[in-house]
């Protein structure tokens, strides 16, 4: 045998192994922005030789994780293709059938132009909440359309920009009426035909705040001296109570008794039936799911709330309003923000800080695309098929509970009920088994004539009768609701609902809105405490698979096997990441997860005979949701001081814990802290609270700094909520959806919500906090995909890179802006706070001026004035490549140069590029330019912008004008005539 040539041996030594080649296909390389060489350079800037050395310096040794995060079969990462294939196999265990179960969830056709250009479009789904209005005009307009749609269909005065779901909206309406009503009663009456899941969430919310929930026939609503009444319109079983006079008399009676009325209304029905605002409702709530948003096994969907004008300043949730910009042109913004938890804390109208913007945009665009006539046709067709189905069932010999309905029939089926239910499933149709003698059938826009005939055949076979002829039956049916209940008022008359009915028009309208906004598809969004990381396409793909999107939340268990497996695996993944023993995925938002966690703590104390424990210690630096959630959970908030370094003041904590020892329920801390540092004394904080009988709630908002490196369940936490829309890659959607799982130690596991749906003992659970057992189930595959593709080492690398990037930004900017808080060794966690107050004192330039000027550079602003007024908080995340980090740093340095020119007098203190930012194209191109700086300085402060320029569509929004002149509906087209 010939010996190998020396040159061949050398080549073989350089030849990569197959394992090397496969490793380079790892998803972590796609998710983590800085390359290995770039990370080395960044570490060099910080004075470290390795990422491990940096992490050792940042994270206190006492809490450093040593177990390597046991992810089981997901410890090793899957490639994108392998993860998709594995999840496809799991999804294939679900069975997609036609679900006519109803109960607030209906089949719907998502128009392709909306599916592709909103739900599947990163320009929409990667955007943040529009707190910076100048770069959010597109989605603000879309949400204003949503508000106008709800206002018109409900005939109310004002609507908010979506709620988490219908059940949450009902619970919020209850607390709203308690706040604003004049009644001293503690009774809230819920009609017995309200959706069961709504009633359960209302009960959960009522108990800790001392509200007594009473149920009974809607006709008895005025007999219970209730401060509020909740009616379903139409009822859960489909029935309408009577004619218009019946509804008016009912609301009049409630008002005369000192109460107020909430109507839970079906928006599609309101295209045909008199609106609740026309028969006396004070608040109208509901769900917009059937406006083009799939079942998704229960969510996410956009709930809604509309109120009378007198209640607008007490309404929870976000509200889009119209104001003017610096040039006097109309501009959209979030209005009345002083109601919200991030400002009013425990005095807020609600703890909600997540809406359902992406789903609300879809629903509003469904209305825009179909228009008033199109929606009415859909409703008329659904009703015609429902009336035809009813007539045929009567002809076969069945009795209906009500002859007045919109789309839902309750059929008296007697001893045939169970067999009929099974027979319908055998024909590919799910019905609702109400009890052992009745079946419910809810029709929707996906139902066809063939479906009606198939149902007749099932029912006829059971009755040993012949099915009727469709055409003959349909020809003889009349509308199945009272003539006086027919809607007479116009709706959706604004031009936006009457101009975009061709697909070309709609496509271009959606593109025009997206072009107005900054999202992650254009630029980094360095918002502190928000974790705006990559939402990878591979993670998003499964969301629209029919096996996930077309499953009804109340579908039989044998049709949801795949969902249960995926959910169980994700829960185990999250337990591994947090160090806790159990997780519930039910909460629809971080705020809801917080609330659930506090209810769990209360239930735990009560189970031990210590229900009197109601004091919640909260550091002064905490996020506003913390005190708002504690208040909602019936707890007394006691504030703990922070020291000059931003850490919890241990002496003050010991004092407050001892002072309230007998009644101490919990402490709520965020870790790393909201000041962006790993506090060295966190274990001592936990020990102090535990020694006084309290539980430790670790807010998981900053979990992106701990996955793989530290675990709250290991260093003393008893319960945490997570934000899957931060740490685990669910996109923010412009302000929702979100998922806020609650994770607990073993001793708290029996109290988790949603345990019954998982087949576990639910005797001690706190009750449901959202409408669906698994919350926003259809977006859970995003987090499953992320974890499966990253594996344990990849997740840890992501955390370490996030910390590296934050410290790199802080180090580079420190010579220009003071970094307010640092931990040991002068380092930060995954975010840093720049103190603008000294500069403002010297120059008059505020953090807001800098935030608005960043828009001229093509950047979204960092978080303003949280947790410290007059600051900017920056969180770059692990996904941003070094070139983007440097582009942002260069912009901030250039802005500091402009501030220096103000200080030196080269720029006027009032007439400078910062005070007038952002600059629109119209301003820069105007014939008149009277500023003391050049157009080029305004629009192109750095040369790179010439190749890549974003133009804000409006100038700086006037917040004061907007709140003083509150207008929260679509702007008349005459306002835009000048454009």
Curated annotation (Swiss-Prot):
Enzyme class: oxidoreductase
Residues modified to N6-(pyridoxal phosphate)lysine: 726
UniProt-recorded Gene Ontology molecular function terms: glycine binding; glycine dehydrogenase (decarboxylating) activity; pyridoxal phosphate binding
Gene Ontology BP terms: glycine decarboxylation via glycine cleavage system
Keyword match Oxidoreductase: yes
A Pfam cross-reference name: GcvP2_C
GO cellular component, one term: glycine cleavage complex
Catalytic activity entry: N(6)-[(R)-lipoyl]-L-lysyl-[glycine-cleavage complex H protein] + glycine + H(+) = N(6)-[(R)-S(8)-aminomethyldihydrolipoyl]-L-lysyl-[glycine-cleavage complex H protein] + CO2
Named cofactor requirement(s): pyridoxal 5'-phosphate
Function as written in the Swiss-Prot or TrEMBL entry: The glycine cleavage system catalyzes the degradation of glycine. The P protein binds the alpha-amino group of glycine through its pyridoxal phosphate cofactor; CO(2) is released and the remaining methylamine moiety is then transferred to the lipoamide cofactor of the H protein.
PANTHER family: GLYCINE DEHYDROGENASE (DECARBOXYLATING), MITOCHONDRIAL, GLYCINE DEHYDROGENASE, DECARBOXYLATING
Record's subunit section: The glycine cleavage system is composed of four proteins: P, T, L and H.
Family: Belongs to the GcvP family.
Listed name of the protein: Glycine dehydrogenase (decarboxylating)
Species whose genome carries this gene: Ralstonia pickettii (strain 12J)
Designated gene of the protein: gcvP
